[in-house]
A protein has these predicted regions:
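Glycine- and Gly-Pro-enriched alpha-helical subdomains that act as flexible
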Residues: 178-200, 206
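Conserved alpha/beta cores of soluble small-molecule-handling proteins
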Residues: 1-171, 175-178, 201, 210, ...
Length: 251
């Protein structure tokens, strides 16, 4: 008999069925929160410090207190992983501004709601890695702070649904004729043996694999450049790649 999944909520490890938050939590009312996702391979977290640094940046950018140090986050996650089954896992962290009377402006003296869960991660199939995946395109209609890993993801949800309705894995988005990113992935192109990626700015979320791509290209002497990439360049690319915590790197 399988034991019930255990999650972390506001300082307590509790069964998932017993975890609950107020309906007045600003994450529920406004999507006023930040999240982070850390992949785990063979029970070892992938670049945890970089993920936690991004969490810290996103929290600071919207004025939500980060109530834990990186060391405390890592200890909580390690404790939760001990209560979780499996070898390859996905750690989901969510921090909202907390519970307050409904009003748009930031409330005073609220305590952030902290939620963490660990789920099994299967990763892309061998066929997906070898044959590639289907993508569709659309105009990027999201807000102008996509560099913040916000829980307000309706634009991303609509883009993902657009892909699902066309039997594709992802929707690659363009803003004003230039590549931004997919619904939940960064997008890269290969042209003339050079790896190209969009510039790091407010229109894209800087995936943790940005740094990995830079390191691998430097190590293997592969030309690498980050710049504005026109839509026509994507359609004429020698190869298009997706990268994310769950998709890893996919053609």
């Amino acid at each position: 008999m399988m034991t019930e999944q255990v999650v972390y909520l506001n300082g307590q490890f509790v069964p998932l069925s017993q975890a609950s938050v107020s309906v007045l939590d600003r994450g529920f009312i406004f999507g006023d929160g930040i999240y982070e996702v850390i992949p785990v391979y063979q029970r070892k977290m992938f670049r945890p410090q970089q993920h936690l640094e991004r969490l810290t940046r996103s929290l600071a950018s919207v004025g939500i207190d980060n109530i834990y140090s990186n060391e405390q986050w890592l200890q909580i996650i390690a404790n939760l992983m001990e209560k979780s089954e499996g070898s390859d896992l996905l750690v989901y962290i969510q921090v909202t501004r907390g519970v307050a009377k409904r009003a748009h402006a930031f409330p005073l003296n609220t305590k952030p709601t902290v939620f963490i869960m660990v789920n099994a991660m299967s990763g892309p199939s061998k066929e997906m890695r070898e044959r590639g995946v289907a993508c569709v395109t659309m105009q990027d209609m999201r807000w102008l702070h996509c560099d913040i890993k916000s829980t307000s993801l309706l634009g991303n949800v609509l883009a993902a649904q657009n892909a699902a309705q066309h039997s594709a894995l992802e929707t690659i988005q363009f803003r004003d004729g230039f590549l931004t990113e997919a619904s939940s992935s960064n997008v890269w192109i290969v042209k003339n043996q050079t790896l190209l990626g969009p510039q790091k700015n407010n229109l894209v979320l800087e995936g943790i694999r940005y740094g990995l791509f830079e390191e691998l290209c430097a190590k293997h002497e592969i030309p690498f450049e980050m710049r504005a990439i026109a839509q026509d360049e994507v359609f004429s690319a020698d190869e298009v790649l997706l990268s994310s915590a769950t998709k890893e790197i996919l053609p």
